[in-house]
């Protein structure tokens, strides 16, 4: 959808194609309501947000065998995700929901750097 997401997808695919991450795969734009099947941990506001068909994760890296989520990845546009914006509030809501369900969420800013190293470091911890 966005160049920054296309670049991140290519990076994720490249990283998980290595032998040490062969057990992993990635899904793009996964609706949150397909991941959170039982919203009992959520309050009304969180539930409304999570069950909205438009609410999605940019990427979900999961275990190929168990199909269990390993880590979610979000690419945040610099201007769109400014502090105190509506999107920043939704980001915090999504962060909280993912934490409630024990799924790590890694955010990358479009004006950031070191993405490869950060992602590999996190994946190495979860694959051990």
Residue map of PLM features:
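Nucleic-acid endo/exonuclease domains
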Residues: 1-72, 79-128
């Amino acid at each position: 959808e966005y160049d920054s997401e296309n670049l991140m997808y290519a990076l994720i695919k490249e990283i998980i194609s290595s032998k040490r991450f062969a057990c992993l795969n990635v899904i793009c734009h996964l609706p949150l309501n397909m991941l959170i099947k039982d919203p009992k941990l959520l309050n009304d506001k969180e539930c409304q947000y999570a069950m909205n068909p438009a609410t999605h994760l940019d990427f979900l890296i999961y275990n190929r065998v168990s199909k269990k989520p390993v880590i979610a990845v979000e690419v945040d546009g610099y201007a769109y995700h400014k502090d105190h914006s509506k999107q920043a509030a939704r980001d915090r809501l999504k962060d909280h929901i993912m934490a409630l369900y024990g799924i790590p969420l890694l955010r990358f800013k479009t004006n950031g750097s070191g993405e490869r190293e950060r992602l590999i470091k996190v994946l190495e911890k979860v694959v051990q």
